[in-house]
């Protein structure tokens, strides 16, 4: 580890338990893994809870890199400060924090949070407000927040923000596919607080839950007339769509729902070009961890070079999100406590991969 200020009364161990990729990206539990490297710009966090996200199994499945620690969203307690942060006063040892990291990162293999300790970028880590429990804090995490900053502001180009909402005259309708997912309920809140009108697509069984986050209208994707119904409701003028799922059937529905003049389709997964059938619709893939400003060393369209401007935007965005957390305006997704520690994470990953989770965020206690 780099020189850092640590909690002297509790010396850090030399090894930890972590979930790490093996050959072919197969994830397994290791009990003698090294602690993550603490760079000057990072803080070391003793993990209390982790959230399980679809990206956690997808990263290992699609981009197998033996040695990578998996896991993105966490909450925990600061136990060491990188040299850049040791004297700033922004963080101190013992602080309760939450955030998101680029787990299963081929060029930073020790960073994942499915471990006893995680090394987190301090500028993209939140202080947990006093009113919030650590389980809910893990559900907030940071991955979705960063992704939506890039998606709503830079990809869809929406005006306004929760800090500075647009007036009614500038409000636009935004379709959120998979509105009952954690990204969906977060997007719905941010859109509503920014002055816009979030329209959700999800299963009818989750309508009441999504409405409670601010959706103005909901449509059931099971309906054979879902796209036509959306076009009718929006008077054929819909021009902004967010699709966290980005499978062929979701892309088809979103393209069919888009208004006559077209618009922007923001995908959070790589999209198949053959389903992007309308020239007036401009598709774009957003990779959430690009908000950190570093290189994304993946492939299949997810790769990107370092972009310092995204980091500048991201720091400002996270500062605004901290304000929302502190004021209690930002709600986390409904939590489903999942037992079993590291074994529980492995079981939870299987449930997500086999699509057995709906309208809930799986949270596992580690510390």
From Swiss-Prot:
Print the keywords alphabetically.
NADP, Nucleotide-binding, Oxidoreductase
Q: What is its EC number?
A: 1.-.-.-
Molecular-function GO terms, alphabetical: nucleotide binding; oxidoreductase activity, acting on NAD(P)H; trans-2-enoyl-CoA reductase (NADPH) activity
Q: Which CDD domains match?
A: enoyl_reductase_like
- The EC category is oxidoreductase
Q: Which Pfam family is an annotated match for this chain, by its short name?
A: ADH_N
**Sorted alphabetically, which SMART domains does this protein's record hold?**
PKS_ER
User: InterPro entries in the record, alphabetically?
Assistant: ADH-like_N (IPR013154), GroES-like_sf (IPR011032), NAD(P)-bd_dom_sf (IPR036291), PKS_ER (IPR020843), Trans-enoyl_RdTase-like (IPR047122)
Q: So where does substrate get bound? A: 143-150, 288-292
Binding-site list for NADP(+): 55-58, 203-206, 221, 268-269, 357-358
**Pathway field:** Mycotoxin biosynthesis
Self-association state and partner proteins as the record states = Monomer.
Hey, which family's this protein in?
Belongs to the zinc-containing alcohol dehydrogenase family.
Task: Outline what the protein does.
Answer: Trans-enoyl reductase; part of the gene cluster that mediates the biosynthesis of the cytotoxic leucine-containing cytochalasans, including aspochalasin C, aspochalasin E, TMC-169, flavichalasine F, aspergillin PZ, aspochalasin M and flavichalasine G. The first step in the pathway is catalyzed by the hybrid PKS-NRPS ffsA that utilizes 8 units of malonyl-CoA to iteratively assemble the octaketide chain before addition of L-leucine by the C-terminal NRPS modules. Because ffsA lacks a designated enoylreductase (ER) domain, the required activity is provided the enoyl reductase fssC.
The protein here is known as Trans-enoyl reductase ffsC
Origin organism lineage:
Eukaryota, Fungi, Dikarya, Ascomycota, Pezizomycotina
Q: Its gene?
A: ffsC
């Amino acid at each position: 580890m780099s020189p850092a200020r640590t909690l002297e009364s509790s010396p850090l161990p030399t090894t930890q338990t972590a979930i790490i990729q093996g050959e072919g990206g197969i994830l397994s539990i290791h009990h003698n893994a090294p602690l993550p490297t603490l760079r000057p710009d990072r803080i070391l966090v003793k993990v209390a809870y982790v959230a399980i996200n679809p990206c956690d199994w997808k990263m290992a499945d699609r981009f197998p890199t033996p040695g990578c620690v998996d896991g993105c969203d966490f909450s925990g307690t600061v136990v060491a400060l990188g040299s850049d942060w040791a004297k700033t006063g922004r963080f101190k040892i013992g602080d309760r924090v939450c955030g998101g990291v680029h787990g299963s990162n081929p060029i930073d293999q020790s960073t994942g949070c499915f471990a006893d300790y995680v090394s987190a970028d301090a500028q993209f880590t939140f202080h947990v407000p006093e009113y919030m429990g650590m389980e809910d804090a893990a559900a907030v995490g940071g991955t979705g927040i960063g992704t939506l900053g890039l998606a709503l502001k830079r990809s869809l180009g929406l005006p306004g923000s929760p800090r500075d909402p647009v007036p009614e005259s500038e409000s636009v309708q935004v379709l959120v596919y998979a509105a009952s997912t954690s990204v969906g309920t977060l997007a719905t809140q941010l859109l509503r607080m920014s002055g816009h009108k979030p329209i959700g697509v999800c299963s009818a069984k989750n309508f009441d839950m999504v409405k409670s986050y601010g959706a103005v209208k909901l449509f059931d994707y099971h309906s054979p007339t879902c796209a036509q119904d959306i076009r009718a409701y929006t008077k054929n003028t819909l021009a902004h769509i967010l699709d966290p799922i980005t499978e062929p059937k979701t892309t088809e529905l979103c393209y069919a729902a888009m208004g006559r003049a077209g618009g922007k389709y923001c995908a959070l997964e790589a999209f198949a070009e053959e389903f992007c059938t309308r020239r007036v619709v401009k598709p774009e893939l957003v990779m959430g961890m690009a908000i950190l400003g570093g290189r994304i060393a993946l492939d299949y369209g997810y790769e990107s070079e370092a972009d310092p401007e995204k980091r500048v935007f991201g720091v400002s965005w996270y500062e605004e999100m901290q304000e929302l957390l502190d004021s209690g305006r930002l709600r986390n997704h409904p939590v489903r406590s999942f037992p079993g520690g590291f074994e529980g994470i492995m079981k939870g990953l299987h449930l997500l991969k086999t699509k057995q989770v709906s309208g809930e965020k799986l949270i596992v206690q580690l510390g």
